């Protein structure tokens, strides 16, 4: 893999190129196929160490994130595994867990038999989901949603379609297409949310699919459509788009997270969020703020519980008065 060192991690995530190259991802996939998961995870240590040592800004931002978790957990009484002041091992473990999630993605997308054990939390809500015509599953860049989509196939016939912003993941999408083109059939690639995209998504919901999307990052097409809400002790910008989208689709909304608890086990957490997202005319901005606040509070809970699986490696709290709005 090559080192595209990122000099300014305060830039929006969509302006930052992927670290690593297409051939590097190809090599990891080939190594996985030839040597298996165990040896691939062993290989991860020198690979992750290289990226960890060469990304000074990433290490700094990781430490700032853990400091937020540590301070917030102490002041709010939130449940957190971080009962000690954060150190280098916490930072490295977060980088390594991200590498492990990539290995799991290779296994999931490769079409091989996925043998990882899954523990479901709130499975009764998932059972209810099966009875509905369609739903939106709101998640975030914590854990591994690709693993979730495969695990869900053992529990329901309902298809989970992943809404994926492809521009920043161009290398990985190319490799996936080569390794297993069928793996992309459950992916809905987008650049921007426009009328044609909305019609396509509405059809998927009407056909009874569940639409999975992340609601923690601002999209490239609308960086100004942001609302700041409290998150881990400070105001953080969250996109309006997912909530406007959910209101237009007019279906039930759930929050869902899939986090690797051990080497061969994942925990899936699903909770009902709203029967329907409503944004009435004059109260539109206030309601948007309320929905995003509720989501951020829910996300905060999982960040405190699984801080080493938070995979936003940029300044999440960076904001500008010109591009974000306080309501």
For each predicted feature, which ranges?
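Membrane-anchoring hydrophobic helices of lipid-metabolizing enzymes
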Residues: 2-139, 175-179, 184
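General small-molecule cofactor/ligand-binding pocket signal
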Residues: 121, 188, 271
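Short, contiguous strand/loop micro-motifs
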Residues: 15, 49-50, 113, 136, ...
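Catalytic core of membrane glycerolipid acyltransferases/transacylases, capturing the structured
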Residues: 81-83, 87-100, 133-192, 207, ...
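Non-catalytic C-terminal accessory region of glycerolipid acyltransferases
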Residues: 154, 178, 182, 195-327
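Short hydrophobic/aromatic residue motifs in ordered secondary structure
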Residues: 39, 144, 310-311
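A conditional alpha-helix N-cap/helix-loop micro-motif detector
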Residues: 116-120, 142, 169, 191-195, ...
